[in-house]
Amino acid sequence: MTKQIYIFNPEHDLCIANGDENFVPPRSASGFARENRDLSEYLKRPNKQSRQIIPWGWNPSLKKRLINEGVDPAILPSEDELQFIRTHSRREFALDVHSRLNCVHPQVIGPDYRIVASSVSEIEEFISANGSAVLKSPLSGSGKGIRFVRESLTESDAGWCRRTLNKQSSVIVERRFEIIKECAMLFECHHEGIDFVGYSLFESRNGAYSKNILASNEDIEEIIAGYIPRETLITTREEVKRILTDALVGHYEGFLGVDQIICQAASPVLVPVSEINLRMTMGLIARNQYDRSLLLIHEET
């Protein structure tokens, strides 16, 4: 097989949200990519993908950049593939996957904790019924596009909602939970199906990624099992994999992460599909780094 080339383009979420191939990311985002280009080494792992180029994430801006650098367009994703990625990067896809889960358990939150609102009045009704809420734009990046609301919309909140509705046609409105742990299931999608790659355990602040915990899959599963029954976690994983297989195989090739939340209620509960990222994640980098370090230790001993 031809040697694969990995590209670390963390500005991907901003590019996919904008959608324009001529979009120029903010200097801070492009600067972060340049300063941390060595992280591309930790994107590498055995995979079943057919493409020679494997980026953090595919978007029109990256495709145009590569073509301008002389890459043959024939080895890059088609316009239809890029549109599929953008459509399924919207938060509505996570809600759709959640609603199709056949996993009924008292410690697994159902999909009705959030709605896809198409008007400010819908948003206000949800907040009135549920109190504190989280507002999310369908497409956003790096913690942007997320607002936390208590009891009612401020003028600033309402203005943000109107702008988001005008630009992206909807706003995701969620009940706000007390978060105990944040984790993710990592997968690889290829032409033969979807493989489970591993778990990720991470922390965020105000919706923006903060850090990952380096640990084995077994240790992370043990930590999660301290709150949620292990069999429930495994059933959820297989259900998520089944639904993603139906939705993605044949249309998307690459890695993806399904973010999950363990929340405090009468007893700990699992939000099984909080976000879906059709790209690589920092959790995958952490998984690769841990697994590679473990391999080196075994080789030395």
Where are these regions (language model features)?
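A conserved active-site cap/scaffold subdomain adjacent to cofactor or substrate pockets
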Residues: 198-251
